[in-house]
Amino acid sequence: MKFSKGIHAIDSHTMGEPTRIVVGGIPQINGETMADKKKYLEDNLDYVRTALMHEPRGHNDMFGSIITSSNNKEADFGIIFMDGGGYLNMCGHGSIGAATVAVETGMVEMVEPVTNINMEAPAGLIKAKVMVENEKVKEVSITNVPSFLYMEDAKLEVPSLNKTITFDISFGGSFFAIIHAKELGVKVETSQVDVLKKLGIEIRDLINEKIKVQHPELEHIKTVDLVEIYDEPSNPEATYKNVVIFGQGQVDRSPCGTGTSAKLATLYKKGHLKIDEKFVYESITGTMFKGRVLEETKVGEFDAIIPEITGGAYITGFNHFVIDPEDPLKYGFTV
């Protein structure tokens, strides 16, 4: 046997949404900042993403991250998130998964009842409180980056619907278009997942053609990357139910941590949520995240919040992926 590359990764899922976490076997990722490292991956090491996210090793809805070093003295490590379509600046479910893996595999020393971890992503520093009981991670609470309502009641003509829709654009680590399902004439149900995917990608691409967004402090964040469609909950314990569409038509199986942060910021700015008030977001699969507003802050001229998201993650496998130089599909493929 002769292989040109061997990549080590740990698989986990956070409330149903996968995270394949690369922990070794790739070249050094150069860059002073995490945004620089993200750009270096895009330009020089994108085969890692395509090989692990795409078939035959992955699938259309695979999600992952790469653990790397950070130049931030507060951070235990750096993290860069990825999916089938590219790289993300922040991911809530991915942060919960990475924190769980870091503690349960000994990357970070386990401390009961709470292990504190700081991770740096391109969007900023993520603080995680890992709840540990009998040497097992029970749940993780992440303090996300400052989140804010960027544009309220935006309008967009959607050709496939033959109508103009109204929605909000909010930041929760990435920019989200947040749309009530009734605006689209759909329900957030697994039986409607195909139409939800189609509409989500159509709307995201139209927004990026028609509407300019720019994070006031992070120059590299200037597109709406995800569409969050929300509805009334199925579970009486939940406040709302959602589905997030991203990448190349991927469907988040979890309630989406960054999407929950963006929703918290939206509700708080509109006066529909108070500091420390209970908020529960249900996913299209029925799993749930707890969210709360910790405090107010500012991002440039925008009123913002510091959100906390709580959920659970579980390790599902330890992988040593190999790449055969003679394999015509060695770096993955999509259909």
From Swiss-Prot:
SUPFAM superfamilies: Diaminopimelate epimerase-like
Segments forming a coiled coil: none
Organism: Acetoanaerobium sticklandii (strain ATCC 12662 / DSM 519 / JCM 1433 / CCUG 9281 / NCIMB 10654 / HF) (Clostridium sticklandii)
Record-level Gene Ontology MF annotations: 4-hydroxyproline epimerase activity
Family recorded in the similarity comment: Belongs to the proline racemase family.
Signal peptide coordinates: none
The protein's name: Proline racemase
The entry's keywords: Isomerase
Alphabetized InterPro entries for the sequence: Pro_racemase_fam
EC code: 5.1.1.4
Lineage per the UniProt record: Bacteria, Bacillati, Bacillota, Clostridia, Peptostreptococcales
